[in-house]
Amino acid sequence: MALILGVESTAHTFGIGVVRNGKILANARSTYTTEKGGIIPMDAARHHEQRKYGIYEEALKEAGIKESEVDAIAFSQGPGLAPCLLIGMKFTKEIAEKLKIPIVPVNHCIAHLEIGRITGAKDPVMLYASGANTQIIAYAAGKFRIFGETLDVGVGNFIDNFAIHAGIGFT
């Protein structure tokens, strides 16, 4: 009955989930928002830095566990915004060293596909459109494969730039 923490910090959200044998026990998170414009990576990273310990305590409380019960900690290693990813990685290393537990790096895109597989989707295909990344990804022949990707402006960057020019905030 492995008890796993998962740390998400790829962009606007800092979150910590707690899972035991496929059952979600907690999903605590805080989202960086702006009133005007898109995500400012350093501001999002500051948001994560300021909230990480509170989110951690909230996740443990929501799951009804003590940190000493945690068997391993996973974290999103990318893709994502480098300053935000760094906060999540450092936090993960800190907790893992404190608890003397293993770290499991996770690819954010693959995690989305795995959720599809875990929930019973047969051969899930994903259009991943986030920031500079726009890819068509699927599981085929025993591997995750990229079947296509943009060679110029990513859909996420296009949407961010449009929102900035239109004066739309990020919420």
Q: What name fits each language-model region?
A:
Residues 1-171:
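Short acidic/glycine-rich loops and adjacent helix/strand connectors
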